[in-house]
């Protein structure tokens, strides 16, 4: 049959739209103005940033400040005025109200403060208590901090001062969130002093640090697209916005937002000024006038070629049939392990509506996963495996053969496959009713289910890696490749060609998955680095998924979240040299999940509630015969 010449109206329309958009961009680019940080309000040496404001137009009255004598800032809370000493990204250091001069010790009632949804006393304060009757309040090691007196000298016996009984609020044993300093009167204390000792340092600043945050559901809590949301440490249900690395600003959509930051010629620049090359308006106008006609001619030529291009058969795609038809008989699949069906490419193409983007579930290093419906109404997952040549085609066919023989309750059931020569290999999985883990995390998922899911995934990956020959490595483990059945049990899909995959990259991918479980956010390389920094600096609560309400969780669950974050850290740090592998991660996660029988979880899973022995890998991570998935006959 001679080739068909069919005009493509959709392609022509696409080119026409592209042409119009390009012309609009070229003609308007000279009118664009570079971004710049808005100038903050000033009071003496202080720069006032969002959400704080001096003007009466502030949408949140709680953050309205007053400037006296054009130099002194005050914060007003419940009819009390606190002089501001210093601003921080997460709080502000204030002086004692109604205190005209610095005192070595203050009365326990001299700092009246009631925590609210905007402000709370920070954990970073260290308290020096005077004349306490109960010495159990004093904490060993606290006095090693450099705490300075009113004269600027360090408080110690040689300088004539003494901090008395030293107590860090981060201890939480005597003082808790919401308390004021009068709580120390229970221990017979008669006075106190306060210093801010930032985390990671031992040098104190005299005053009381108040943490600030905005209620999670407030319109002012919306973050800029280049910022992330962090939970407040001492204010339940409130958050702050923090710009990503390389960006500056307050992070809030209604504030200055986040602008790109860079240095040029010794000066710090922001926004569009950080672009590598700048042109003035006249140059851009000339450039647009030259490029526009050239683009029009090129588009018309491309459109003409497109309309005259013969429509080719699908069989011409990806592989040369003439050189590969003899290999069909060499593709062998074992029978009897799992009743699988051999699909045609056309069947799966129809099931996925021609592999439309609307059917796409996720895309990764191993290929693309689609949602589809077979002609009998069965909903399925179709994995179009990435394949570049005949050798990879044969390797993938062998791996699918091997994978089909593995029966495990956390391995998504393989319904069938398509190995038509000339197309990418297609693997068809059963579609679990609760969709992908990534989608469920965006909708909200309680901690019990999260930790059970990653424990199951770790057990499966360790089993495939160490108890199968040849070993099976998942080269793209992610929340998009993990699906959940009606009981929220994990069903892993997305196995692809094991090109030169190393175990350390698998451990890194698994660490990213654990961080997503903790934060509820899809992780990128830069966000992984930021999350690990927060974990190592003791600020885990700032990255925990806000939908889990970290401070409202039972203590046991908060400890478990910390343990999972620690496992993620070790996967990154020690996964590359083999000091911490998937077996180690599986052992610890299964132990965490196995302890969740009480404490608010519905019930233990059959596979998790077993007691595993350290003497055997199979005893430790494999599932009992009852937990292995057997297809119905």
From Swiss-Prot:
Query: Where does this one sit in the cell?
Result: Membrane
Residue stretches making up the Protein kinase domain: 355-633
Q: Predominant location of this chain? A: membrane
Looking at the UniProt entry, the stretches that span the membrane are 286-306
Domain of life (superkingdom): Eukaryota
Q: Where is the signal peptide?
A: 1-28
Annotated membrane topology is:
Single-pass type I membrane protein
Glycosylation sites per record = 45, 69, 231
Cytoplasmic topological segments: 307-633
Binding residues for ATP: 361-369, 384
- What Pfam families is this protein classified in? GUB_WAK_bind (PF13947), PK_Tyr_Ser-Thr (PF07714)
> Record's Gene Ontology CC terms?
membrane
Residue ranges, Extracellular side: 29-285
Q: Which family does it belong to?
A: Belongs to the protein kinase superfamily. Ser/Thr protein kinase family.
- Report what the protein is called: Probably inactive receptor-like protein kinase At2g46850
